[in-house]
Amino acid sequence: MLLGINNDPEANHKLVDEISGKAFSWYQRLVSKNFGSSKYILKSIDSNMFEINLQEYNDVVRTNFDLRKNGIVFFFRFKQQEFAESCIYEKITIQSSDRIFVIQTDKNLYKFEIINTKNHLSFIKNLFNFKNNKKLKS
């Protein structure tokens, strides 16, 4: 679910926590070896309710991913607005090629440019581990 954070930050952060779970503490991150991802460049968003058009935007929109207990979260800024995408693992599909990383959530399709391939592969492994562990515990 894509949320505009600026309107009501407290309520929107609470909604993100309800969907994907709370962010891990530093200790939990060390134990689970979950440090999120490296930076990605957001290239496009298909079918979003905020009508974000990155093709006509001159600045670079960067983001990184946070793996949580129930799902994935990422934040980005576009034209002085902060947005968050939060989705449970069961509704996420991904595709990855040499330089492009595509994530389809429950409502939107995102294309990212991969900046660091080695870190990207490590993140994909962590994502699959979290997704599979979630399925095993259910």
Predicted regions and their residues:
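Acidic, Ser/Thr- and proline-rich intrinsically disordered linker/docking segments
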Residues: 1-45, 91-138
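Glutamate identity and glutamate-enriched acidic tracts
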Residues: 10, 18, 51, 56, ...
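Generic short beta-strand segments
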Residues: 38-47, 70-77
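A low-complexity, Ser/Thr/Gly/Pro-enriched, surface-exposed linker/loop concept
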Residues: 40-60
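Phosphoinositide-binding peripheral membrane targeting modules
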Residues: 56-64, 68-95
